Amino acid sequence: FEQKSQTEKEDFLFFVSLAVVSSDTNVVVANIVSEKIKIIPFDEEMVDSVIGNFRIKYRIYENEDRLPMTNPPKGEKVYYAGSDIELAVDYNEKNVLNGLIKKDYFKDYFFGYGIDITQYGISSLRILSVENEVLILELQICVPDTDLCCYFILKIDNEGLMKVEELFDDFESD
């Protein structure tokens, strides 16, 4: 994976105020108001680790998704950058899985609870263990800066087949 430098910054987008005037009547027919939008970047994470007979490499990086802040400061629109995961798994030094993990892969789990997945983003991935030649990972998908999360267990066998299990969620208590 390529390592991309991540700077401590916040992106700002500005829309310019514009009034459209009819040339026939000199009447304003449209008015576009200026607006400041703040985008909080995602901090990229890279892991390259060996556990048992598995080598796992993954990179969690910022994508083009924009997740709205639940309680932005008054008069501001604030978004968090979303993320995707590049994942590569080797077993006994042979590559068995290369893939991209996107939050949309999990939308059916959210649909069952009537939850709008557009507010959620991939938060983290961590290596848990290896059991019976199966690599076990935990994936967390959350609404940024809240405790609304859904956890998934990803089980990857020595042939690269992945099984997804919902581990725990906050939806059932709602």
Which ranges hold each PLM region?
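Surface-exposed acidic loop/strand-edge motifs in secreted or periplasmic proteins
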Residues: 14-124
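Acidic, glycine-rich flexible loop segments
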Residues: 108-147
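Short, low-complexity, Pro/Ser/Thr/Gly-rich segments in the mature regions of secreted, periplasmic
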Residues: 155-174
